[in-house]
Amino acid sequence: YWFLKDKTLGQVMVGHIPQASQHAAVLVDGSGTMVAANWTPINSLAVGLTRNGVELTAPNPGLGLPVVGFPVGAAMWCGSTSLPTGGNCEPISIDGVRYDSPTFAGFSASASWGADDFWDVALRYAGEISGFKFAAVAAYYHNSDERAYTGFNTVVGTSNPLKRDAGYFQAGAYLQHVKSGLFLYGAYGKEYNDNILDDGNAFKLGIPGNLTAEQPDGHVWYIKAGIRQNWLPLGATVLYGEYEERNDMFHPDMIALGVDGSQNKQWGLGLVQEIDAAAMSLWLTYRNYETSFSGPGVAGAFDNLDDIDVVTAGAMISF
């Protein structure tokens, strides 16, 4: 992309841009744990749902098709972008135009637009008050482009949208007591879905388009608390705990299987160690996922799902 920037008038970007709401709630997290732990489920497809130790699969209609497994991302679905990334529902840059205002007393605003159509707006604040760091954002995104974000559906064999009309609101805030290093971060997201999917693709079982129009408006909330202190000469050490709930953010193809509601609960603990001399962060994290579905087709098929435990070690060098 290319851009024009002026200290007084702000900045305009044109091309393959990060939209105004992209990662909005994630990026206000100033704890140093933003990459190691946020509300984006980076392993949503790598981890499969199981019941009594057996992988959960869709019914096989006897057409010689491969068996379809259910990753935990089936309960983390973003209707506005057809991606298993709830609540970070706008993670991918797209072609468009974006404007960012100058900062006034800690406040700034952004807006972006792209053809066929998407648009979004965001309002941000960052500052320090009475020994506390504080940052917050609120953003809204609307997408009515059926052609956008269809590659994922095609690859995994789920239904593409015939009509996309979906919005997503998100808000996030971060508060840290500077002297003690104690911090609190929270985020909330709400979907507004009015999509209609291809009525013949859902697990090859067939799903009427009028049913997919009944996909609920899911919501998600996330909270993280901890302490950030320079206990070692290497750099800051961060200890944290997190909790998240995603409600009714299931993939709409599951309506064909009698699902009309879902809940995904997540909690975790983690340690991040910064190494200032190398611009590096090291982390070790643990997460537990508890997933459930509800509806007339759930009993005996999707009930009593096993919890999922995930341990992750990682490193990042910033340059």
Q: What residue ranges belong to the model's regions?
A:
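Outer membrane beta-barrel
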Residues: 1-120, 124-130, 135
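Detector for outer-membrane/organellar transmembrane beta-barrel domains
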Residues: 122-274
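Membrane-spanning beta-strands of outer-membrane beta-barrel proteins
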Residues: 92, 104, 116-118, 165-168, ...
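Outer-membrane beta-barrel "beta-signal"
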Residues: 307-319
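Extracellular/periplasm-exposed beta-strand and loop segments of Gram-negative cell-envelope proteins
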Residues: 31-71, 75-88, 149-151, 158-168, ...
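C-terminal closing repeat unit and adjoining cap/tail of repeat-based domains
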Residues: 270-291
